[in-house]
């Protein structure tokens, strides 16, 4: 196998000469996994037409093979799609019209790792579960500590080595004079007061606390630090926290803080994007003029007063990610004018002020704005928040949560409840994003997109929603036994251990507004759509790559009685409605019988793909899971019930189903 990161089709080896003006440094390789590695080098010189990296399983790769560009003189590229336990050769190169200059050959070996298809023995189960409450959990892996971390609103955070045993902590704030600053002091004075535009330094000093206070004289910062997202910036070699400083009347901003350790302390660097300059001269206190140029007055498209929410975003709920070419992006927004996307500058972690966005559309139908970037979902004050984007198995998946975040049960307030995760996907990081019915994530007018009155065509795959009476856990007493509802504001991680984890907060049927974090494994079905395991993750060993290659549940173990749960749209959250299971039997001859549903089932040979047809065809996966019970701590792994389970999606409707085998 040979490949090359670059952007020229010239096959000439060149070789360079002693008088060459081109120069390349020897690559450094880091963040090596079983399928990827990060390479860095510098390529400079006059007359350069392209630069990049060549890599191969053979020595001294050249540019005569597949190429992907290295963008800047200081190049950082993530090599993906590598084979596990394989030695690769990599060279940096620079090319002009007359020559190609190569660096020395460097080798690295991908890990044999747990992302291969080897079988693992499950060593822990539900006894390892330790619950935490983190609202709006955003998950990230820190290889230096071998921990997963989740960061949420109001400074809630937790860590775990296994996605089950969570330990809470608080990351401190830093200022110039303190490593444990208070909330009211932490966001007033940015460390960065000049930003780059057109190669020049431009003054910008933004007081995030003062901006959000404009929306309400009684403003309390303690209640308005929302939904952070944390990522390690490879260029900066810093942990970067993107934090929403929310304010009333859209006076919000997303700011970036940095730390040397993932646990902090985090210091405020600068704002990334700001909302709420809907009238007067308030825009003078933002970076609007840095982005679009000097203005005699506020441009009319922003001068909309209380109409802001139909057109433009509330700048909260950031999701920051690297695409497969190494470019840094941020999606953001909540209800209001939808979800938007900006390109970030990896050198600074802030918005890339040199990327221009040409105004597209007019009025409330603006889809590209010179300041806010590109709209990818929502709009017209349709519900939707908590965008999260992750690249999984060839697609960028966009998660959003529709509806109101509360537990529901208030017929007089339709927006109280109905929180539900929806899924879209795209082959490009900035869209277009569509659901399994090919419906676009963007709206062209106001529609109601959640609850019993939903009239938007049931947009977005309903990966799962409120449910009760499910499994052993939900047959006893206590709030957990009452069932989950209002699940959402999730994150998702395609982890280095070969599993993909969906992390979300949930409320419960009989616990008011109390909430906890839950984690489910997620798989791709045969059509490449995501389906979630029916029970939370409790140490199961099945890996994402095994689904297409191995039958994880033997055919003779599948037949039997099953509980079937259908996650349909339009549950009446005002009445705290939940999906409840019914009973079916998967017969050994491939038929399904039951009082409500009958049909057929089949497993694709040599895989874990299952097809369930109960009048409508669902495509999913069949795995084995461990059923939780209420008294987990008093048991060991061998005491728990392991049973065949399926999770499947009907692409034509976006409805998902779950099932598990049970004994009377």
Features from the language model and the residues they span:
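C-terminal motif of bacterial Sec signal peptides marking the signal peptidase cleavage site
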Residues: 2-3
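Carbohydrate-active catalytic/glycan-binding domains of CAZyme proteins
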Residues: 112-664
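Short, surface-exposed linear motifs at loops/turns and structural transition points
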Residues: 8-114
